[in-house]
Amino acid sequence: MPGPLRSLEMESLQFRDVAVEFSLEEWHCLDTAQQNLYRDVMLENYRHLVFLGIIVSKPDLITCLEQGIKPLTMKRHEMIAKPPVVCSHFAQDLWPEQSIKDSYQKVILRKFEKCGHGNLHFKKGCESVDECKLHKRGYNGLNQCLTTTQSKIFQCGKYVKVFHQFSNSKRHKRRHTEKKPLKYIEGDKAFNQSSTHTTHKKIDTGEKPYKCEECGKAFNRSSHLTTHKITHTREKPYKCEECGKVFKYFSSFTTHKKIHSGEKPYICEECGKAFMYPYTLTTHKIIHTGEQPYKCKECDKAFNHPATLSSHKKIHTGEKPYTCDKCGKAFISSSILSKHEKIHTGEKPYKCEECGKAFTRSSHLTMHKIIHTGEKPYKCEECGKAFTWSAGLHKHRRTHTGEKPYKCEECGKAYTTSSNLTEHKTTHTGEKPYKCKECGKAFNWSSDLNKHKRIHIGQKPRT
């Protein structure tokens, strides 16, 4: 270790040094899937620091994310750490400690004490998580604070996190000298930094320059690409002690644990239904208002949730980036893949207290429970017909609109539901997947099989 470094005060790397914060405007530009992505990245970063023995106490942001609370509901300075960070943390060199434990580099920070004591707020001023974070308000004294322009890099063993100090020195200097940079105006939004402006423009233009070499999926931020790449790895370090299920993300693991505890603290004032998470309750409330603000430009179909719209769009593109390791079947979303994987494991963690029947999905259990209550909460505004499930109402509405969004590529015939299209396709392939257990006769359609079964029980088939 260099001689002068020994005389300087040392301090361990903290979570705030690897945390990413969005402004209120940037946060509102993200859909639910992207917000969940942010949550996973933050929880992964925290896990890495805990693994290295760098973090002892849990930051408020992590507690917030684990409980499903949106981070912007907290005060700015409370999100990353308590007490608020002082400017000296932005004027530091990073040096690897000489002793290496378990092949990981433990990082220590050199802190410059001359930099002042102002409490500062965070602002994400970079395009990627690989750049260091910047603060908003500065003060004079840069020459006392920054003693070198040399670029220092910190690398964390297996999980590589790189921070470039030099890349942000000019921005940091601007804040100390109080020189105002050129303001970029785009519609009704203003930006102090060209990089923030550039990132925002990518959202507006739809530009996605960061492409995954594995599956071809593109992103408008390199950090989103980095997080996406995890979906292609098979590593699942989080294991549930209750049922043995493993997870890639700590957030997914935390979510899963609530299945066993049965905790549902978020209750709908309208109908009394309880939920595990606040964002699930928010989504549920739209059922009562009937609002569907998210519209598909391809077919004009509307949705009450942005994530549902994102999944729907893949019907038009045919994109299926999530593949099952067991059977090779591909899916349009990771959540559908997770549900599919339960077919191979046979896991059915959701059990009905009324009759004991078990299900692979919580939504299936919820739908099943309505059988016992006889409740039909979903009512058609056109004709008044009521349905047990929202999916039933959604399909029924198409009888009024005449909409048939599912089209056969082979012959052009269109259908109101994807299941009808799937069954239709068997007429082209000659496949007859529905087989009678009594006599072995096979059918293209499940409805034809049901009609046939009546022959064996002595009923006349319906015409």
Curated annotation (Swiss-Prot):
Q: What is this protein called?
A: Zinc finger protein 486
Give GO cellular component annotations, separated by semicolons. Answer: extracellular exosome; nucleus
| Segments forming domain KRAB | 13-84
Functional note: May be involved in transcriptional regulation.
Q: Name one Pfam family in it.
A: KRAB
In the UniProt record, the signal sequence range is: none
Keyword Nucleus listed? The answer is yes
**Which GO MF terms are attached to this record?**
DNA-binding transcription factor activity, RNA polymerase II-specific; RNA polymerase II cis-regulatory region sequence-specific DNA binding; zinc ion binding
Chief subcellular site?
A: nucleus
SUPFAM superfamilies xrefs: beta-beta-alpha zinc fingers, KRAB domain (Kruppel-associated box)
> What SMART domains does this protein map onto?
KRAB (SM00349), ZnF_C2H2 (SM00355)
Q: Which parts of the sequence are C2H2-type zinc fingers?
A: 154-176, 210-232, 238-260, 266-288, 294-316, 322-344, 350-372, 378-400, 406-428, 434-456
Name the Gene Ontology biological process terms: regulation of DNA-templated transcription
In this UniProt entry, which cysteines form S-S bonds?
A: none
Indicate the family of this protein.
Answer: Belongs to the krueppel C2H2-type zinc-finger protein family.
Q: Which UniProt keywords apply?
A: DNA-binding, Metal-binding, Nucleus, Repeat, Transcription, Transcription regulation, Zinc, Zinc-finger
Name its cellular compartments: Nucleus
